[in-house]
Amino acid sequence: MGEVFAGGFALLVVLFILLIIIGASWLY
C-alpha cells in the first residue's frame, strides 16, 4: 500500500513540475 502511495505521490510531483514549466513558458 505504501509503494502505491509513493508512486502516486511521485507522479503528482512530476505533473506539478510540468504544470509549473508549462505555465512559466506560457507567461514568458
From Swiss-Prot:
Compartments (UniProt record): Membrane
Presence of the UniProt keyword Membrane in the record: yes
Membrane topology annotation: Single-pass membrane protein
Keyword terms of this UniProt record: Membrane, Sporulation, Transmembrane, Transmembrane helix
Gene Ontology cellular-component terms listed: membrane
Pfam name, any one: YjcZ_2
Matches recorded under InterPro entries: YjcZ-like (IPR010070)
Top-rank taxon: Bacteria
Transmembrane segments: 4-24
Induction, per UniProt: Expression is regulated by the mother cell-specific transcription factors sigma K and GerE.
Keyword Transmembrane listed: yes
Family: Belongs to the SscA family.
Protein name per Swiss-Prot or TrEMBL: Probable small spore coat assembly protein B
Source organism of the structure: Bacillus subtilis (strain 168)
